[in-house]
């Protein structure tokens, strides 16, 4: 089984957790990025740097991930494309994307995009701390177990 990572936006702590799970469960990890990254020095990890361009990494993930695999991403429209293809998607904060919550997640994302463009809200997400790492580890374990069972 493969775990794909949208590597440009994934926190290093989450990438490190994914590699630990991969070593323990004998999984392949594929990091896809639009910019060069530091690849963890383990044989189970591959780094693919796609040509720069709008959504190039997203397009690569959608084209190459298959049902039964997991993609780690924060990008809600990317997750929507993956879910429609039957690929599991999880954000680095431990929130799983699925058919039931995708409409709401897209609506919230679009609302905040509009508010940011109007200058009504600023900044991004809260810092990635221990609580987020634990939530991610728990969700990652749960989803990998489910996918392994088929």
UniProtKB/Swiss-Prot annotation:
<dbReference type="Pfam" id="PF02639">
    <property type="entry name" value="DUF188"/>
</dbReference>
<protein>
    <recommendedName>
        <fullName>UPF0178 protein PSEEN5341</fullName>
    </recommendedName>
</protein>
<dbReference type="InterPro" id="IPR003791">
    <property type="entry name" value="UPF0178"/>
</dbReference>
<comment type="similarity">
    <text>Belongs to the UPF0178 family.</text>
</comment>
